[in-house]
């Protein structure tokens, strides 16, 4: 599992890349393991390798790497609502989110869960998107053309209850459909500033999760045990950001769930590596073209305070 890759695709072996992750997945499969590759959001935005074609090549790389599932993070909306929806259609893998709603119909925009049957077990994933998307993307993208009213919502609630209710409803659906294991695939994070919408608070106010793969706060968290509303402990994990790690969650024959974070991998899928190299070269060439010269100095951070002034 990955999260918050943010288009950092120009790493060098043995650092992690989509080519390395594709090779890692194949290696596990060749060893007789059943493997699912999932992402917890924020994969199409962050560098020019994403913005130069609005995430098209990133999705192509994820397709080639063999991703099976993803949930949208707040930055999946940075290129506008139409592009966000187009990206999800370009993906060969499904997106899920239990709390992204079309206010015109009252219906969820995406499936709330995805079930996989593997080795006789039914593994359900529940997708969750941060309600902070409204403030950490562009609110106008969630409005009608005249920007007079919102036509989409990311359910949250000032006290978090709308979010908790949406998540619990999705968990209950997975249970009804016979899930053996239920895993959250969320872009929520654990930063206190995200309260009451953190993954820890969602776990604490719901029942039914066996594990939760998180994103958003860029936190390196291999395995944290969080009590749910019934007192049962749930494994919470997050890889950090920018391909610093890829997570490996293992469901043992005895049902025990373990996680580890992998920092480097020597292997690389040749086809995925070639796609990445071609795009990196093309973007680097475009960025290297001088189009103007300015006499003034431009700052992202305030020189006096060091605080970021431009987003």
Residue ranges and their predicted role:
Residues 1-267:
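Acidic, metal/ion-coordinating pockets
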Residues 270-311:
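Hard-cation-handling environments
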